[in-house]
Amino acid sequence: MNKVYLANAFSINMLTKFPTKVVIDKIDRLEFCENIDNEDIINSIGHDSTIQLINSLCGTTFQKNRVEIKLEKEDKLYVVQISQRLEEGKILTLEEILKLYESGKVQFFEIIVD
């Protein structure tokens, strides 16, 4: 059975087999929220403000859950990502991450291992 994950980043270290193909699509908030509202999704986000942002935007009830992701063929990964580099060690508050979202600096992606 294919797995579906939620994360705040994508890394090559998540891939288990090489060579491999990965399809990355930028999606809007609505599509992101529809796809993560799934009881089988494996949440791997370990940042309070990111979880609060997702719950606020999508009406979900995720909790922090810092787990390792290992993607297999046909697995999906939904990513919420800040599109600007933060100061080293910066931990965002909910207000700060909401401000980034409102200014278009938070993006959503669907990643599929092909």
UniProtKB/Swiss-Prot annotation:
SUPFAM superfamilies: STIV B116-like (SSF143602). Pfam families: STIV_B116-like. Coiled coil: none annotated. InterPro entries: STIV_B116-like, STIV_B116-like_sf. Gene3D superfamilies: Uncharacterised protein PF08960, DUF1874. This is Uncharacterized protein 114. It comes from Sulfolobus islandicus rod-shaped virus 1.
